[in-house]
């Protein structure tokens, strides 16, 4: 989206308090193109199975059984296999990047992908910070992001005396069509810098072009930040981050807003595992109100109907 506000010092758009309900280097076989079974086990650090964890390839969602096993038919375009972090498990952080780690890259030659989660008591209260439109275009702006926005986050977290866990999520446009700055922004948002795990949402300026398809336009982003449609739960709040940019990709930054049919199906499946008494927060880049209102918008009404099934739901 064209910059709603280019904030660095005031980069924290939302401070919300809610009350509670293995890393891959990216080297090797190219993902996609396979249709074989995709399966694995989700266990805790002691090796015990964790039942009821939702696992996805970005197209299909399934859930682990009593033995911790999940299985699904891999979609040909699937790039990652990943889990939705349950409320009673820790947000794992990649030791090399410092960002949340809940996914593994899919390889044609590999069918089994196991995950180890760390159990914890379910949080009854926590804080979530939202960061909007850093949209950096130079290393100097990355430096400002680190010394102003990240510094503000650290100051805010340090000032809290109640000991509540704190998380953060970006709301898109991490860069302004300068995709070579992704590694710098990964470093800037590492937990060692921000003091909190920072989840990501893709924006229109995060799609690389020219590319052949909308999917290929998001691959460079995914290689740095992970899946573009995913979820996690803290307390009784289920967070969903989605790509609501349908990018033309071929030769310009033209796009429309909305969701594709397979994204809507993925969201339906993800939410089918969430109790209706839970709150749902959908994080997207293009606002459902007051944002880009193009003729190409798709599935906005259907998504709102899905969210209306829950006692509490918000779109950020």
Each predicted region: which residue ranges?
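Short, acidic Ser/Thr/Gly-rich low-complexity loop/linker segments typical of extracellular
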Residues: 53-74
């Amino acid at each position: 989206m064209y910059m709603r506000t280019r904030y660095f010092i005031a980069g924290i758009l939302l401070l919300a308090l809610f009350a509670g309900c293995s890393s891959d280097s990216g080297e090797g076989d190219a993902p996609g193109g396979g249709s074989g079974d995709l399966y694995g086990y989700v266990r805790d650090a002691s090796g015990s199975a964790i039942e009821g964890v939702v696992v996805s390839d970005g197209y299909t969602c399934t859930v682990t059984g009593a033995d911790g096993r999940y299985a699904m038919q891999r979609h040909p375009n699937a790039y990652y296999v990943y889990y939705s972090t349950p409320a009673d498990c820790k947000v794992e952080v990649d030791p090399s990047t410092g960002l949340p780690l809940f996914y593994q890259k899919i390889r044609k030659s590999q069918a089994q992908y196991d995950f180890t989660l760390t159990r914890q008591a379910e949080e009854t209260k926590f804080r979530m910070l939202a960061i909007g439109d850093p949209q950096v275009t130079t290393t100097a702006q990355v430096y400002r992001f680190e010394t102003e926005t990240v510094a503000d986050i650290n100051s805010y977290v340090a000032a809290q005396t109640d000991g509540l866990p704190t998380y953060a999520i970006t709301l898109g446009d991490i860069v302004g069509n300068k995709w070579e700055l992704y590694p710098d922004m990964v470093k800037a948002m590492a937990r060692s810098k921000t003091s909190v795990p920072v989840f990501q949402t893709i924006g229109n300026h995060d799609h690389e072009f020219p590319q052949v398809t909308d999917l290929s336009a998001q691959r460079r982003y995914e290689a740095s930040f992970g899946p573009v449609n995913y979820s996690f739960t803290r307390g009784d709040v289920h967070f969903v981050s989605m790509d609501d940019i349908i990018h033309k990709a071929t030769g310009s930054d033209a796009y429309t807003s909305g969701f594709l049919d397979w994204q809507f199906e993925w969201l339906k499946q993800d939410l089918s595992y969430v109790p209706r008494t839970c709150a749902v927060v959908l994080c997207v880049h293009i606002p459902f109100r007051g944002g880009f209102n193009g003729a190409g918008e798709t599935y906005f009404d259907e998504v709102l109907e899905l969210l209306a099934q829950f006692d509490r739901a918000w779109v950020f």
